[in-house]
Amino acid sequence: MLELDEKKIRKGKPIGLPYQGSKKKISKKIVEIIKQNFGTEKPVYDIFGGGGAITAECMLNGLEVHYNDLDETVTSMFQKVVSEDRDYLKTLIVSRDEFLKIREKENKTIDDELKLIVNSFGNNRKNYLYSEEFSDLKYNIAIDVVKNHNTFKGYLKTKTYIDAVNNIKDKETLKQLGRIQQLAYIQQLERLQNININNLEITNHDYTHFSYLSDAIIYLDPPYEKAHLRGYSINNFDSKAFYDWAYKMSKKNIVLISSYEISDSRFKCVYEFKTVKSTFAPNKKSGDKTEKLFMVKKGEE
């Protein structure tokens, strides 16, 4: 099993796009595991990079990292957020009506995709954050908080939010008000703007493109078996071929795979994140599954 001294984990919140399937909850631990067990000299290849949580954490820890994802949209969103300023982030909060119009567009811009992420339930880019009954109320509060207080955080203590709460007489409406999730997602994007990506190599290749690698740390977060991921799908992602490739790559590299379980007996669990369970599960039972790291068994390399 790999070691992790949690006292050495970077202080502060994890960063990355608010992206479905993101490793943000465990990105700090994963990168610290890499540092403590394999050092800081080898380059890290984040080949299924998704929302960039592992890549960003590597950068904050001073590791050389290569950010790749087959879905060019997600890497473009990452670059867009980092390259823009705080005022740009304010434009990403949209109403339910605007969200639905954007969703139905055939050709979406990167701005459109970011608006869908920030304003969708579970960042799925399909369903608006709030029910139709309460969407206007919560959207208007979000806009007013940003306009009146120029803040994305601490909004629960702003006069705008407090006044809105005090003006609500209906108990059910008050109960539904809760958090203004758009502001929480914008906070995540704002933290992402603190990194410098001038020297970051970003690509959009299939994982097999990296077959040339040697003496590198290859971090893999592939579509989990019986699951679905943007860019790949359950119909065209061959898990067996992927495991064969990862096994082959482990002969000249350090290969780490994130998953709940791996059916290939050549791999074993080397670390389990016992407090992090599945949020978007491919089936009902997988809600009890925990995130794990896998490597090729010793003697199998």
Question: What label would you give each PLM region?
Answer:
Residues I30, V44-C58, Y67-D71, L114-Y128, ...:
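Conserved proline-anchored active-site loop of SAM-dependent methyltransferases
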Residues D5-K7, E225-K226, G231-E301:
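Long, positively charged, glycine-interspersed low-complexity recognition regions
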Residues T40-V44, L63-E64, N196-L200, K251-V255:
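Short active-site oxyanion
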Residues C58-L60, F210-S214, E261-V270:
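Short loop/helix-cap segments at secondary-structure boundaries that form the rim of catalytic
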Residues G154-L156, I162-L220, Y224-S250:
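Acidic, His/Gly-enriched loop-helix segments that form or flank divalent-metal centers
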Residues M1-Y45, G49, A53-I54, L60:
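S-adenosyl-L-methionine
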Residues N61-N198:
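Class I S-adenosyl-L-methionine-dependent methyltransferase module
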Residues V31, K35, T55, S239-Y247:
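Short amphipathic alpha-helical segments and helix-helix/interface helices
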